[in-house]
Amino acid sequence: MSNNILLIDYETLGQSPDTVILSLGAIVFDMDDPPSYQEVLDQGFYETFSVDEQVKDGRVIDKSTVDWWGQQGKEAAHVLKPSDDDISYKEMIPRLKEYIGDVRGVKTFARSASFDFSITNDIVRRLGQQLPWQWWNERDTRTLIECYLELLEINKKNNFDVPDQGVEVVAHHALHDVAMDVIRIS
């Protein structure tokens, strides 16, 4: 068995490629032996980032997104509060590369590809870094889920229900969102 899937998810303060990122969740795993929800939480990559540093570096905040965050539950809003655990966004790519390991043949999925990948591309371009995965292996989680639903003739929205995971699911938490997508695609 080898790790052949990487799922990523950002939580942000906007929708543009140069938006401030609040957190990044990721999991690398073998599709033939996918992790449980709890295993994603235990083994996944999760970092929160300093907002002030990003604003000083010219990353942007969208007021409508900030307003949207204000309407989310307090579990989700935890990411808005500065924490001693916040790291520099400049450390994100090296840490993610270390977590991922060998990326040859790894398919990298995001929900949606035009959002998460554009943010990563903006960061690596600005910082003169390299993508932590092979760009030609980028995939869209929504498309995969949609095809799966159509194949099984399930008439549900793209965010279809998943069985009880035995842990509290936190919406709009990057690592929990990744865990939900692991369950959906496996």
Describe every region a protein language model picked out.
Residues P132-I154:
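Short, flexible loop segments at boundaries between secondary-structure elements
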